[in-house]
């Protein structure tokens, strides 16, 4: 891959992927921005009830044949899908970076973790054998078999547009379910490319569908009786809402809300190792991940000055700019609203008595002068 991907492209429309085909939909759209430039990259369709119904019908109709497909045949498709993901890794990572903003190294790491789940799904046939117990009772043999649920739905966040969907759909589909993915409308393109690659690998039409949309699309998915299971990763308020709605409608639900994490550095800690861990946890992917240190780092008075000094030195060495430039260590936050929110946190901390040791608000990056924040460090005793 070249040192910098060309991010200057014509604005285009992003639709859906239903029944093995790209589906155009220009009725209601939302802008998709390149966070590194602040420019509109595309317009993504926001599916209405009729489009959602088509995706559900496609998945529902495909379920009977797919659940009857031999596990070994499914595995062959998954091996091919894994191969295509690796062959198209550069293209997938470029889409992640152009729409999310994270640097290419972070995008590659994300994709790699997702492919690990696909690899695990390649061995799913060993997990579908059920159980048999001879003589469980007098003249009684006991056996059980594992059966797919039906049409499953995955609703995923913006911060890991490849990895989090791959937590969900490979396992569901390998087990004989069909699937509808509703990715974040902020960075939808990588999900559509994955759907195309899956079908290229031999997945029958309708087994994997992608519907772009907002709350209206989610509500339509949660209300339809043909949906058997829902998986969600995102903010806690939405996780709670989705759990209530989906369980009320009789669906199996797993809903993972946001995390609030802190770190504690003990007096006998390896300071250099601790600082390296803090750098990755606090600033990796611009801190836009659930396992980021989003609350506080607790340090005793004896170590605080040493840790802050080492952090400050490492921060000064980092290069910040568009994620498409492989020489950069950190890219932009995904939206201007996200940048403003983090800036407000800094101002709130100062108002509450914190000392601003490193102020990241004055960073200027050519081409998007107001779109970037540098790392910041606040200290409070």
Residue ranges, per PLM feature:
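ALDH superfamily catalytic-core signature
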Residues: 237-381
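Hydrophobic face of alpha-helices
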Residues: 56, 75-82, 93, 111, ...
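Rossmann-like NAD(P) dinucleotide-binding subdomain of oxidoreductase/dehydrogenase enzymes
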Residues: 130-275, 327
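Terminal low-complexity tails and localization/encapsulation signals of metabolic enzymes
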Residues: 1-43, 76, 80, 130-156, ...
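Generic secondary-structure signature for well-ordered alpha-helical cores
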Residues: 61-68, 83-90, 101, 116, ...
């Amino acid at each position: 891959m070249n040192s910098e991907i060309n991010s200057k492209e014509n604005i285009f429309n992003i639709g859906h992927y239903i029944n093995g085909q790209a589906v155009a939909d220009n009725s209601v759209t939302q802008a998709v921005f390149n966070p590194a430039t602040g420019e509109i990259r595309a317009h993504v369709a926001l599916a209405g009830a009729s489009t959602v119904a088509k995706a559900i019908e496609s998945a529902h109709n495909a379920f009977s044949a797919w659940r009857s497909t031999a596990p070994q045949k499914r595995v062959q498709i998954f091996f091919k899908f894994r191969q295509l993901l690796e062959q198209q890794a550069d293209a997938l990572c470029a889409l992640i970076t152009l729409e999310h903003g994270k640097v290419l190294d972070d995008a590659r790491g994300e994709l790699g973790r997702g492919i690990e789940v696909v690899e695990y799904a390649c061995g799913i046939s060993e997990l579908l054998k059920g159980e048999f117990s001879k003589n469980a009772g007098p003249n009684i043999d006991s056996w059980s078999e594992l059966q797919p649920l039906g049409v499953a739905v995955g609703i995923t966040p913006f911060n890991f547009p490849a990895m989090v969907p791959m937590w969900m759909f490979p396992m569901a589909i390998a087990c004989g379910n069909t699937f509808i993915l509703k990715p974040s409308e902020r960075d939808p393109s990588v999900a559509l490319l994955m759907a195309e690659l899956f079908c290229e690998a031999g997945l029958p039409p309708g087994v994997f569908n992608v519907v772009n949309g907002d709350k209206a699309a989610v509500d339509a998915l949660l209300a339809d009786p043909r949906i058997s299971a829902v998986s969600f990763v995102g903010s806690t308020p939405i996780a709670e809402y989705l759990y209530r709605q989906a369980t009320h409608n009789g669906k199996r639900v797993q809903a993972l809300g946001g995390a609030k994490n802190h770190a504690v550095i003990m007096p006998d800690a390896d300071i250099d190792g601790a600082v390296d861990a803090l750098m990755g946890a606090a600033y990796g992917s611009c801190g836009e991940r659930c396992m980021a240190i989003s609350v506080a780092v607790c340090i005793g008075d004896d170590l605080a000055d040493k840790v802050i000094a080492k952090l400050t030195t490492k921060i000064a060495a980092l290069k910040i700019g568009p994620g498409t430039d492989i020489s950069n260590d950190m890219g932009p936050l995904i939206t201007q609203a996200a940048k403003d929110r983090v800036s407000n946190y800094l101002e709130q901390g100062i108002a509450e008595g914190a000392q601003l040791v490193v102020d990241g608000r004055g960073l200027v990056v050519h081409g998007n002068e107001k779109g970037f924040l540098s790392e910041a460090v606040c200290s409070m005793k």
